[in-house]
Amino acid sequence: MQGFVKDFLKPNLVGIEQINATRAKVTLEPLERGFGHTLGNALRRILLSSMPGAAITEVEIDGVQNEYSIKEGVQEEILEILLNLKGLAVKLEGKNEVLVSLTKSGAGPVIAADITHDSDLEIVNPEHVICHLTGNTEISMRIKIELGRGYVPASSRIHSEEDKSANGRLFVDATFSPVERIAYSVESARVEQRTNLDKLVIDMETDGTLEPEEAIRQAAMILAGQLDEFVDERIISAPVEVEEKPEFDPILLRPVNDLELTVRSANCLKAESIYYIGDLVQRTEVELLKMPNLGRKSLTEIKDDLVSRGLYLGMRLENWPPASLIED
């Protein structure tokens, strides 16, 4: 049996096609027939949900008590500034968290390059616009950046009454994963006389903080680490009955009326063809704010209700909507 296992072909990373600064196609071949989809799907899921990275988690802006405050002389609303800060692509080396500062005065744009930081932090997109100042105005803020993994909503980092009542501390929903979009395809490959082999092509878009080759290496290490225990022949465990799970969490299949929202918020969502919770969680904060008659308070109401159910905005749902909803 061991001999047959060792006879399996081992893939090589044969090419990296750099499409632009943040997007690349990575090709691995040759693979045994069927292994293209097996590895492609596993790597895709890991790259999207489990890659470590750095993100902004907390902000303090002078003169601002909460995200609904108004900052005189700043073109954007505070909520929009926080959304812009989430767009910063940063790399953190040697530390688990850092506190940086930004002070800018005079009319014009405030960009990522205006942030004062040490050498352990690298800002990959220094031209990213944070806000615009109008007139002879000054803005000053402190920004907390942490290492993490996946998506962590702001509400999960509020652990005490002191955190809840802390005026001026603006907690930010953190997306730590540097991989923003990924798709894969499986093509035919050939080795000598064998023509029934697979070639795996992974199309990946990141925030620029992680090279494609390194991303594949890290994802493969995570996958291998999860499988290590199965390789040890000394481990013999009783079979575990695994309950078959539905394709989607039942909560996602429920109508938005089931959320504890005001009539106005629910009507705004339906006007944009958002009928199910699964439709809603795939929208981003920016998309919802662009909807007519849906303001910041309604957005906060929606986010809080989703977080209470273990959900958040900007989720990626494969194969949505399910056939059962389409048939209905």
Swiss-Prot record:
SMART domains: RPOLD
EC number: 2.7.7.6
Keyword terms of this UniProt record: DNA-directed RNA polymerase, Nucleotidyltransferase, Transcription, Transferase
SUPFAM superfamilies named among the record's database cross-references: C-terminal domain of RNA polymerase alpha subunit, Insert subdomain of RNA polymerase alpha subunit, RBP11-like subunits of RNA polymerase
Gene that this sequence comes from: rpoA1
Biological process (GO), any one: DNA-templated transcription
Superkingdom of source: Bacteria
InterPro entries: DNA-dir_RNA_pol_insert (IPR011262), DNA-dir_RNA_pol_RpoA/D/Rpb3 (IPR011263), DNA-dir_RpoA (IPR011773), RBP11-like (IPR036603), RNAP_asu_C (IPR011260), RNApol_insert_sf (IPR036643)
Region (Alpha C-terminal domain (alpha-CTD)): 248-328
Protein family (similarity comment): Belongs to the RNA polymerase alpha chain family.
Gene Ontology terms for molecular function: DNA binding; DNA-directed RNA polymerase activity; protein dimerization activity
UniProt remark on domains: The N-terminal domain is essential for RNAP assembly and basal transcription, whereas the C-terminal domain is involved in interaction with transcriptional regulators and with upstream promoter elements.
Name the UniProt record assigns to this protein: DNA-directed RNA polymerase subunit alpha 1
Catalytic activity: RNA(n) + a ribonucleoside 5'-triphosphate = RNA(n+1) + diphosphate
Enzyme category, top tier: transferase
